[in-house]
């Protein structure tokens, strides 16, 4: 529990706003609200990072309303949210405050569902436009002349949930915000940024990269917090030899019989969509035993149709739903009311996500309970043995790099379509520079490349003009790989019942799959893979399906290489490569799993083409002899396979700190017997089609990344491995931490440049050595 710290309303806050707040029962503001509002009224860019339900919305709403009062409604603001639901939720909140103030102002949501008739109205009359980064990128900025009044009077840009802006997506959004500032400046405005976020490890840096300038950080939560009881529950063992425990979903159902009731609301978080549907079915079927009705149990996840999601959100907020089972779809700050119990079925994979889920309960000072049910997964089991990790481990850092060469080039292309670029001569250096698109020294080089090589820019004196009819923003994906959704239809009625991203479709809506929505089941009869449509017939199924995939990495071309010597024997050299690879993900078969008993009642093959990805990869190869010698000496007996996989897991965790991306932007494949190299090979590949330059950055700084990984091991307080380093001992092996440390030491310090170090790419047929021969084959 935490006591509240209330401060007086900031000096300068309009008396009309103060009167409205006092009429609502406010005697002042929480300390963090008051400081954030005071900084905003002083003209500063502000980032407030406090937990869910700490009143962040008021901290950015009041400065916007103050500016509207000062300008008699002429000021305009743009609010960015990561989801449509959040935009619509906040629009309702803001319109309520407008009514309380008695002003004739208007706020509108602008997204893909906004009718054309409304779009013209909101462009002309909307003091507040609530939208998302995708609509800003493809809808507003390229058509800025239609939004001239908005940009000319733009006083504030509000960005909510900025912790969701990381990796490739966050880097692209930072580029979009550069374009926004550039256009606003063109119309004579210089908007201030008001941002909110969950707690971050590098909040100040993250906010500055998004805003393009320093921000004032408000990070001390001074809102009230009721008592919150935490529990970590480890299901009983059913097979000690195999380390298997009772199924977490079954245990969640059993725990619900005790925790769920008609007098309070509960939320259950699952990490997979299938788990959401299975648990929703279980809880609906035992609703009577919990004192509630089946219709008071709802599922909620991505893929539900928008109307269904809005219905569930409203029923949650108004108390008609007693239990909701969800994925991370309800982690974000949409207002669903004050919940009392949170049950996490498994660790969600990050501290940020864990605390977002736990933060859904205990709002507004009430007492609450949060329980995590562990699975047999090694990470979950580690957290059962070391629950202090959940509270003591530092939050993850967020990586954003708007100057990544590929991302910067794409955003410059979009910006050139919107407005010409102009350069000037730097008085100190004599260099030609462009000053309105961030600090990168490569902006002029990129513009010249687009002029001389690509031909879609024309340079006249100091100005670059876009010369083609192309619409570049339409071809630039903010997420790197734009989702290509599959729509699922009821085969009898023809109605759409859901949607799913293409990557997930091969395991969820293949022919024979059981597709579930809130406990109801459809058997997929036909999957039109090319046209992205699946058709299912409603059935009363007593089983669900679980599909398996295989991932294969094949080398296409190697471009750069470093060779290092571990000993005087060239056979024990190790090599680091950068090249192009082909990654295939193939759905191979699916199992039919009986509800409740989890009995496997059959398996069938899946007949779908593989998902294919041509991308860049960083490759580490070591001879079998070297790996065996390193791991079997110094009184160390370590499993080579576990150690090799643990090294890959550690590098995947550490690399984003150098590449300014998310861990999810990288894929890893650890092979003890690579078909390309005939020796152990570790692949770290860019998960975006064609690659976006992450691998080149990794290759150029591999020794720094390896050294940082070794430092992580040395400073980690665990004894034999944990989720923060190489993974739990059950996953990395009992000697995994020590083995990976020794391997890194030899790779960094023990390795020395071999005679063939820093080789240029060799033509096929002229290479020497086992690795090159294998590649030729």
Question: At which residue positions do the language-model features occur?
Answer:
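Helicase motor core with emphasis on the C-terminal RecA-like subdomain
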Residues: 1-24, 28-31, 35-57, 61-137, ...
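A general structural motif at alpha-helix termini
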Residues: 40, 283, 726-729, 744
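Short strand-loop junctions, especially beta-strand C-caps/beta-turns
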Residues: 51, 235, 303, 623-625, ...
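Extended Lys/Arg-rich polyanion-binding regions
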Residues: 367-370, 376-394, 401, 406-422, ...
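Terminal or standalone catalytic/regulatory effector modules within metabolic enzymes
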Residues: 537, 724-727
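Short cysteine clusters
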Residues: 716, 721-725
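Acidic, low-complexity intrinsically disordered tails
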Residues: 747-777
């Amino acid at each position: 529990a935490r006591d509240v710290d209330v401060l007086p309303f900031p000096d300068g806050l309009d008396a009309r706003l103060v009167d409205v707040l006092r009429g609502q029962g406010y005697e002042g503001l929480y300390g963090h609200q008051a400081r954030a509002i005071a900084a905003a009224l002083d003209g500063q860019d502000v980032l407030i990072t406090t937990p869910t339900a700490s009143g962040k919305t008021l901290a950015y709403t009041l400065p916007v309303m103050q500016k509207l009062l000062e300008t008699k409604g002429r000021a305009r603001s743009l609010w960015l949210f990561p989801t449509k639901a959040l935009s619509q939720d906040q629009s309702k909140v803001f319109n309520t405050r407008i009514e309380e103030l008695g002003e004739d102002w208007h706020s509108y949501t602008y997204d893909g569902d906004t009718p054309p008739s409304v779009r013209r109205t909101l462009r002309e009359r909307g003091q507040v436009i609530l939208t998302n980064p995708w609509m800003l990128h493809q809808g507003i900025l390229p058509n800025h002349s239609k939004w001239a009044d908005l940009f000319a009077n733009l006083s504030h840009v509000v960005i909510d949930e900025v912790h969701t802006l990381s990796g490739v997506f966050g880097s692209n959004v930072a580029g979009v915000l550069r374009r926004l500032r550039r256009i606003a400046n063109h119309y004579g405005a210089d908007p201030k940024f008001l941002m909110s976020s969950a707690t971050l490890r590098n909040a100040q840096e993250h906010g500055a990269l998004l805003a393009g300038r320093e921000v004032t950080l408000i990070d001390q939560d001074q809102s009230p917090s009721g008592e919150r009881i935490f529990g970590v529950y480890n299901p009983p063992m059913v097979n000690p030899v195999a380390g298997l425990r009772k199924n977490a979903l079954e245990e969640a159902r059993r725990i619900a019989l005790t925790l769920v009731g008609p007098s309070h609301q509960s939320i259950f978080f699952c990490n997979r969509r299938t788990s959401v549907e299975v648990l929703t079915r279980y809880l609906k079927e035992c609703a009577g035993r919990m004192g509630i009705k089946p219709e008071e149990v709802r599922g909620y996840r991505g893929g539900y149709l928008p109307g269904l999601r809005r219905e569930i959100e409203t029923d949650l907020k108004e108390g008609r739903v007693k239990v909701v089972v969800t994925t991370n779809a309800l982690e974000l700050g949409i207002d669903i009311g004050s919940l009392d119990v949170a049950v996490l079925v498994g660790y969600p994979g990050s501290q940020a996500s864990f605390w977002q889920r736990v933060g859904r309960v205990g709002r507004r000072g009430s007492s609450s309970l949060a329980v995590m049910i562990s699975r047999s997964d090694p990470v979950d089991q580690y957290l059962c043995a070391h629950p202090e990790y959940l509270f003591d481990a530092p939050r993850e850092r967020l990586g954003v790099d708007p100057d990544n060469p590929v991302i910067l080039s794409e955003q410059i292309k979009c910006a050139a379509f919107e407005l010409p670029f102009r350069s000037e001569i730097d008085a100190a250096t004599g260099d030609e520079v462009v000053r309105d698109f961030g600090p990168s020294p490569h902006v002029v080089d990129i513009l010249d490349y687009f002029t001389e090589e690509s031909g879609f820019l024309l340079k006249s004196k100091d100005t670059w003009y876009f010369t083609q009819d192309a619409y570049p923003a339409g071809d630039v994906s903010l997420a790197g790989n734009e989702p290509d959704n599959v729509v699922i239809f009821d085969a009898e009625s023809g109605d759409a019942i859901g949607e799913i991203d293409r990557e997930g479709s091969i395991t969820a809506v293949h022919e024979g799959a059981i597709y579930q929505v809130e406990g109801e089941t459809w058997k997929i009869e036909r999957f039109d893979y090319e046209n992205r449509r699946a058709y299912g017939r409603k059935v009363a199924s007593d089983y669900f399906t679980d599909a398996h995939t295989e991932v294969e990495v094949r080398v296409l071309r190697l471009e750069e290489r470093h060779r290092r010597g571990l000993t005087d024997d060239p056979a024990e050299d190790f090599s680091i490569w950068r090249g192009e690879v082909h990654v295939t993900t193939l759905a191979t078969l699916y199992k039919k799993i009986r509800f409740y008993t989890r009995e496997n009642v059959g398996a069938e093959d899946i007949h779908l083409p593989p998902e294919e990805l041509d991308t860049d990869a960083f490759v580490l190869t070591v001879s079998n002899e070297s790996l065996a010698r390193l791991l079997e000496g110094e009184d160390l007996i370590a499993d080579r396979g576990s150690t090799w996989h643990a090294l890959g897991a550690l590098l995947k965790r550490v690399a984003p700190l150098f590449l300014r991306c998310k861990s999810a932007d990288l894929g890893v494949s650890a092979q003890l017997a690579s078909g390309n190299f005939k020796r152990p090979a570790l692949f770290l590949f860019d998960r975006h089609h064609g690659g976006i330059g992450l691998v080149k950055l990794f290759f150029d700084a591999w020794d720094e990344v390896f050294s940082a990984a070794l430092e992580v091991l040395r400073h980690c307080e665990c004894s034999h491995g944990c989720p923060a380093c190489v993974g739990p001992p059950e996953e990395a092996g009992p000697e995994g931490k020590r083995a990976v440390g020794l391997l890194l030491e030899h790779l960094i310090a023990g390795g020395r440049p071999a005679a063939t170090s820093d080789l240029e790419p060799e033509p096929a047929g002229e290479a020497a050595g086992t690795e090159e021969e294998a590649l030729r084959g």
